[in-house]
Amino acid sequence: MEAVQQNHSVCRGYCGVMLRSRSGGFFRRGFMLGNVEVILARPRGFCAGVERAVRTLESVASRYAGTREVYALHEIVHNLHVVNSFKKMGVKFVSALHEVPEGAVLVFSAHGVSQQVKEESRRKGLTVVDATCPLVTKVHLEIQRYDKSGYQVILVGHKGHREVEGSMGQVSNPVVLVQNVQDVQSIKIPSAAKLAYVTQTTLSMDDTAEIISALKLRFPRIVGPDLRDICYATQNRQTAVKAMSQMVDVVLAIGSKNSSNSNRLLDLAKAQNARAYLIDSYRNIDLEWLIGARRIGITAGASAPEILVQEVIDYLGLHANLKVRTMDGVSENITFKLPELD
């Protein structure tokens, strides 16, 4: 929906401004959507690992502002708003180490990196700050422990995801990746091999349950981590969006298209509610999605900041008489200590 004329700071109610929808129809700004209840998912948005990574990069950018160049290997988290905010602070995002000059400051993203990347960073004399999520680091340590004990490690995850790439590079021996039940049936493992599995942290217990069951069925002696090692944030957000989606007419999931966990929230919302949309910000909202809706649910991926949620609420308030409440759910009080800066 784009405005022929709009003034967000002035127009808070019925302003008589005509809006053009993406399909070409016109609507009048104001309370065109009538009375609408907005239900906010609990929990939503930043998890502790993302919060730690963002605060770490903020600290690094502030400390070295004007004195040394600060680089981040890949996006610090998968969110366009966050990345653009850091670019404005002068942080340079790169996709490979050869783009980082010797002697620069380099921050590893929340998704973690391989041992090879760490070693190459040392050889280049970089000042490295590791913002890897502690739960990802825990998976790395499990892979190393299993490998040292003679196990063939199987990783349940998505090919090409930054976290998976880093996890598979923790040991010199090959780590076998399985993405689905079909992979479990097709992988070739020596019958005498000791097997252990780990999982990508941004997959919930629900996401991995079928694959793990298939692994245990085919390899009855396979071992794996304690269920408490599953990322709490992924599970909590998925549980919340499934419950919220049953309460509302439309779901708006805030997150970037390259965010694995945000896309999963969208999938789960669609499974419960056909009217569900992934948006980077309020600017992506087409008001035609919301016509006839009396309850709108809002969730946000683990890498989406709360400011984006508030901006969506403010935008909806331009077009409806809003009542906003937060659903009952899990309250997360976990924080991770920031890495020390030299």
UniProtKB/Swiss-Prot annotation:
Alphabetic keyword roster: 4Fe-4S, Iron, Iron-sulfur, Isoprene biosynthesis, Metal-binding, Oxidoreductase
GO terms of biological process kind: dimethylallyl diphosphate biosynthetic process; isopentenyl diphosphate biosynthetic process, methylerythritol 4-phosphate pathway; terpenoid biosynthetic process
Keyword Mitochondrion on entry: no
UniProt-listed Enzyme Commission number(s): 1.17.7.4
Residues forming the catalytic site: 163 (proton donor)
Pathway recorded for this protein: Isoprenoid biosynthesis; dimethylallyl diphosphate biosynthesis; dimethylallyl diphosphate from (2E)-4-hydroxy-3-methylbutenyl diphosphate: step 1/1; Isoprenoid biosynthesis; isopentenyl diphosphate biosynthesis via DXP pathway; isopentenyl diphosphate from 1-deoxy-D-xylulose 5-phosphate: step 6/6
Pfam families linked: LYTB
Binding site for (2E)-4-hydroxy-3-methylbut-2-enyl diphosphate: 78, 111, 161, 201, 259-261, 303
Record has Oxidoreductase as a keyword: yes
Xref: InterPro entries: LytB/IspH (IPR003451)
Cofactor: [4Fe-4S] cluster
Binding site for dimethylallyl diphosphate: 78, 111, 161, 259-261, 303
Listed NCBIfam families: ispH_lytB (TIGR00216), PRK01045.1-2 (NF002188), PRK01045.1-4 (NF002190)
PANTHER family according to UniProt: 4-HYDROXY-3-METHYLBUT-2-ENYL DIPHOSPHATE REDUCTASE (PTHR30426:SF0)
Task of the protein: Catalyzes the conversion of 1-hydroxy-2-methyl-2-(E)-butenyl 4-diphosphate (HMBPP) into a mixture of isopentenyl diphosphate (IPP) and dimethylallyl diphosphate (DMAPP). Acts in the terminal step of the DOXP/MEP pathway for isoprenoid precursor biosynthesis.
Protein name stated in the entry: 4-hydroxy-3-methylbut-2-enyl diphosphate reductase
Species this chain originates from: Anaplasma marginale (strain St. Maries)
Designated gene of the protein: ispH
